[in-house]
Every structure is written in structure tokens, then in C-alpha cells.
């Protein structure tokens, strides 16, 4: 069975997932594809492993931006696809292959049906970490073509194909990575009094962190601390000199993020004192909340209901993290969920989005961009 052009593009990209700022094959694929398009009205730049494309409008009054992230995840794929990842231990498990494909489809339509306004397509690396949106936004390459408004999407396994979901205002949470390294004194298991056990210290820290949210954050202002990984020790009869905790912090408000971090630091200081150890905290990548511009989002949802075949759902806030929030902090715009009807969720080794969504999304976004880009 033959597949459509953009389904094939998605499958090509799905085979070559790459982690943040190492998306060299992905970047080259995007550039090669752009090279097949008529270039009379196109301008192309690269930034690190990202790509920025401008389609010059017929009578521009503003610049409309579309952002698509392009990186993969360090996950071993279990989909059983014939076009599964050829990069061992890496997978497009968050749908960025679809995001990029839809962006290329919209770009193709924009070249053949030029609108009045300029369009800028931002193929952004490193959304999964360490974060490409903020440095890309601050780059000279993007500053020259900085959009006046911007939009982005993220696939949603739980929604059916033909459905989008979004809301005015806060959509996604503030997020921060959390790493805590503890160092004490190792020793023989038979002589615990001569050592300083960092497995025990780490265990106490994990349990104490559970009280940060329940006793320091307003119950109406959601927040999460999750410790997803603990490492420490070497063998069963040696007391561990070191341990490391890795986790994530997510809050709906900036104020709660500050409060949570303050309490974490106080608790870690207490662990240092009580276990006579050294502790180092690293917050790693931190992402600003995704806050949709109210008027633009309301207008987009109304347009979708009245002028397209897509179903629109007003969703609730999610504790998801997205560095697109940095772009929305600087540029009016919005993000929305795009239903892909997958049994398995984001970051799962068996995520299998319904490819029918690709053509639907391209047609839908082209309708919106033409409507928005030709209005005066």
C-alpha cells in the first residue's frame, strides 16, 4: 500500500530520532525537503540544529509564527513499526516527528498559496531538554524575523482524530528538573558506626519531600514533586558513600515554584545537618508556564468551531511542561492539543499516533493561517 507524501515524511523522521542539540540528521532532512520547494519567496536560516524558514507574504503587515519541536527521547522503541527507530535507545515517543511533519506540510501549502502576511516556521531543537526555545528566541537569527503572533501544537493520545483541545490563559505548568547529590562516608556493612550511610539519608529525603506539597502549597494551586530515580551504593555489604536523587517539580503558579524550591532547600539543609553529609542541589532545565493569549485563543477556537470540520474541546490545565512557554511569554499566541487517538500515552515506548491526523492537521492549519494572514 502506498502512503501519502506527508505520512512518508513522518515515517522518515520517525526512523531518525535524536536528542536535544544533536538533531543533525533531522535538521538535514528538513533542509533537504525545503530544498525541493519553490524558493522564490523563501528565506532559510539554521540555528544550531534548528531551522528557521520565512515565507514572504504578498502585502505583509505582520509576521505569523509556527513552531514545531524536532527532538526525540532516550527511550527504546516497542511499537513494532516497520519504520521503527534505527537509532538504538532513542525514539520519537512524544510526537515531535508529527509536529515537524505538520510544519513541513503547512510550509508546503504556504509556498503554493501565499498569503498577505509573512510566515515564519521555527523547527526547534531540544524541547525535551536542555531547552531550545529560550536560546533560540534570544538568537540573532530569530530576532530578525521575530513573529508578531505565534502558534504551536502538541499531539494528545487521549483525544480522537479530528479533535483539538485548548483554553484561554494557563494551559501547561511551570516545570523544573531536580537533582540532589548526597555525599557521606562509606564503609563495611558490619561496622555502620564508622560510616555515614547515604542510602538512609536519601530515603529520609524522599519521604520528607512528600510533605512539601501537602503542607506548603495551597490545595487550590496544584503542584507536584516526583522523584523518579535514585542511585547509590555498589554491593550489598558496603555502606554507600554517595547517592543521587533525580526528579521533577511542577507548579501551576510561579509563586508556588519559588515556594516549593525554598522548602526543598530547607529540607536538604536539614538532611545535611542530621546526617553530617554534603548535599548539592541542581535544578537542571526549567520551563516557563504555557499561557495562551486570551483574545487570540478565543478567536482561534471560534474560527475552528464555525469554519472547520474539527471538534473543539475546552480543556483544563495540565501539569505538562513545554518550553514553548518562553516564546508565549514574549510573543502573543497559543498552543493546543491535537488528538491522535493512541492507546499508549506520551513518552511511552508503544506510542502509536493515528497517521490520519497528519493531512487533517495540515488542511486545518492552512485554513486558519490563510484566514488570519489575509485579514486586515
From Swiss-Prot:
Enzyme Commission number, as recorded: 3.5.1.47
Pfam families from the UniProt entry: M20_dimer, Peptidase_M20
Amino-acid biosynthesis as UniProt keyword: yes
Signal sequence bounds: none
Highest taxon of source: Bacteria
GO biological process: diaminopimelate biosynthetic process; lysine biosynthetic process via diaminopimelate
SUPFAM superfamilies given in the database record: Bacterial exopeptidase dimerisation domain (SSF55031), Zn-dependent exopeptidases (SSF53187)
GO molecular function: N-acetyldiaminopimelate deacetylase activity
Swiss-Prot/TrEMBL keywords: Amino-acid biosynthesis, Diaminopimelate biosynthesis, Hydrolase, Lysine biosynthesis
Involved pathway(s): Amino-acid biosynthesis; L-lysine biosynthesis via DAP pathway; LL-2,6-diaminopimelate from (S)-tetrahydrodipicolinate (acetylase route): step 3/3
EC class: hydrolase
Reactions mediated catalytically: N-acetyl-(2S,6S)-2,6-diaminopimelate + H2O = (2S,6S)-2,6-diaminopimelate + acetate
Keyword Methyltransferase included in the entry's annotation: no
Active-site residues, Swiss-Prot/TrEMBL: 69, 128 (proton acceptor)
Family, as annotated: Belongs to the peptidase M20A family. N-acetyldiaminopimelate deacetylase subfamily.
PANTHER family referenced in this protein's UniProt entry, alphabetically: N-ACETYLDIAMINOPIMELATE DEACETYLASE, PEPTIDASE M20 FAMILY MEMBER
Biological function: Catalyzes the conversion of N-acetyl-diaminopimelate to diaminopimelate and acetate.
Protein name: N-acetyldiaminopimelate deacetylase
Originating species: Bacillus mycoides (strain KBAB4) (Bacillus weihenstephanensis)
Taxonomic lineage from the root: Bacteria, Bacillati, Bacillota, Bacilli, Bacillales
Amino acid at each position: 500500500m502506498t502512503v501519502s507524501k506527508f505520512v512518508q515524511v513522518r515515517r522518515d523522521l520517525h526512523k531518525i530520532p535524536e536528542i536535544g542539540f544533536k538533531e543533525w540528521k533531522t535538521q538535514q532532512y528538513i533542509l533537504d525537503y525545503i530544498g525541493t520547494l519553490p524558493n522564490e519567496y523563501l528565506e532559510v536560516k539554521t540555528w544550531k540544529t534548528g531551522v528557521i524558514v520565512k515565507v514572504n507574504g504578498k502585502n505583509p503587515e505582520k509576521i505569523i509564527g509556527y513552531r514545531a519541536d524536532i527532538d526525540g527521547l532516550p527511550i527504546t522503541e516497542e511499537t513494532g513499526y516497520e519504520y521503527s527507530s534505527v537509532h538504538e535507545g532513542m525514539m520519537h515517543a512524544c510526537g515531535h516527528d508529527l509536529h515537524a511533519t505538520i510544519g513541513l506540510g503547512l510550509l508546503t501549502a504556504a509556498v503554493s498559496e501565499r498569503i498577505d502576511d509573512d510566515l515564519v516556521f521555527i523547527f526547534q531543537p531540544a524541547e525535551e531538554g536542555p531547552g531550545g526555545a529560550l536560546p533560540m528566541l534570544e538568537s540573532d537569527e530569530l530576532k530578525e524575523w521575530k513573529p508578531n503572533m505565534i502558534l504551536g501544537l502538541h499531539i494528545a493520545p487521549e483525544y480522537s482524530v479530528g479533535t483539538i483541545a485548548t483554553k484561554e490563559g494557563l494551559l501547561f505548568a511551570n516545570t523544573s528538573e531536580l537533582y540532589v547529590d548526597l555525599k557521606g562516608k562509606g564503609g563495611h556493612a558490619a561496622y555502620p558506626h564508622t560510616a555515614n550511610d547515604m542510602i538512609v539519608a536519601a530515603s529520609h529525603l524522599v519521604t520528607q519531600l512528600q510533605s512539601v506539597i501537602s503542607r506548603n502549597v495551597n490545595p487550590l494551586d496544584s503542584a507536584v514533586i516526583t522523584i523518579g530515580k535514585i542511585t547509590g551504593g555498589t554491593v550489598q555489604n558496603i555502606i554507600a558513600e554517595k547517592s543521587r536523587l533525580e526528579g521533577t517539580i511542577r507548579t501551576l503558579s510561579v509563586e508556588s515554584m519559588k515556594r516549593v524550591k525554598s522548602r526543598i532547600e530547607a529540607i536538604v539543609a536539614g538532611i545535611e545537618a542530621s546526617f553530617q553529609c554534603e548535599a548539592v542541589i541542581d535544578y537542571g532545565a526549567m520551563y516557563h508556564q504555557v499561557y495562551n493569549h486570551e483574545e487570540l485563543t478565543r478567536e482561534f477556537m471560534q474560527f475552528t468551531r464555525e469554519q472547520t470540520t474539527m471538534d473543539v474541546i475546552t480543556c483544563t490545565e495540565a501539569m505538562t511542561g513545554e518550553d514553548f512557554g518562553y516564546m508565549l511569554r514574549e510573543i502573543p499566541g497559543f498552543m493546543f492539543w491535537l488528538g491522535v487517538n493512541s492507546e499508549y500515552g506520551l513518552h511511552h515506548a508503544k506510542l502509536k499516533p493515528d497517521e490520519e491526523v497528519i493531512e487533517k492537521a495540515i488542511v486545518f492549519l492552512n485554513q486558519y493561517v490563510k484566514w488570519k494572514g489575509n485579514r486586515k
